[in-house]
């Protein structure tokens, strides 16, 4: 261990690992106007999906479990993630986006992340 390096335990260690993976992934990913980046951010309670044009630095479309159309519905988090995926795909298509680059945000491609991605694909987004 390097001098001055903190020893992380529990949830802090998990968050640090996710952050490291996200940095490593983002080195090779970038969204353009033709193919913006679909970013997925997951917490213990909520999931957020944003379609971002990295060149301009603008968010073109977004959806989350905090939206009123999703908030009161399903109790199952995977079902909520599917709804978020379908909603962000619908909003992205309304903004003129057909294809995206998927950024899983350092999370494993499983569970809620995979459910959101599959729902977005079924709704017509290509990635």
Curated annotation (Swiss-Prot):
<dbReference type="GO" id="GO:0006412">
    <property type="term" value="P:translation"/>
</dbReference>
<keyword id="KW-0699">rRNA-binding</keyword>
<keyword id="KW-0689">Ribosomal protein</keyword>
<dbReference type="GO" id="GO:0022625">
    <property type="term" value="C:cytosolic large ribosomal subunit"/>
</dbReference>
<keyword id="KW-0694">RNA-binding</keyword>
<dbReference type="InterPro" id="IPR005484">
    <property type="entry name" value="Ribosomal_uL18_bac/euk"/>
</dbReference>
<protein>
    <recommendedName>
        <fullName>Large ribosomal subunit protein uL18</fullName>
    </recommendedName>
</protein>
<dbReference type="InterPro" id="IPR004389">
    <property type="entry name" value="Ribosomal_uL18_bac-type"/>
</dbReference>
<dbReference type="Pfam" id="PF00861">
    <property type="entry name" value="Ribosomal_L18p"/>
</dbReference>
<comment type="function">
    <text>This is one of the proteins that bind and probably mediate the attachment of the 5S RNA into the large ribosomal subunit, where it forms part of the central protuberance.</text>
</comment>
<comment type="subunit">
    <text>Part of the 50S ribosomal subunit; part of the 5S rRNA/L5/L18/L25 subcomplex. Contacts the 5S and 23S rRNAs.</text>
</comment>
<comment type="similarity">
    <text>Belongs to the universal ribosomal protein uL18 family.</text>
</comment>
<dbReference type="GO" id="GO:0008097">
    <property type="term" value="F:5S rRNA binding"/>
</dbReference>
<dbReference type="GO" id="GO:0003735">
    <property type="term" value="F:structural constituent of ribosome"/>
</dbReference>
<keyword id="KW-0687">Ribonucleoprotein</keyword>
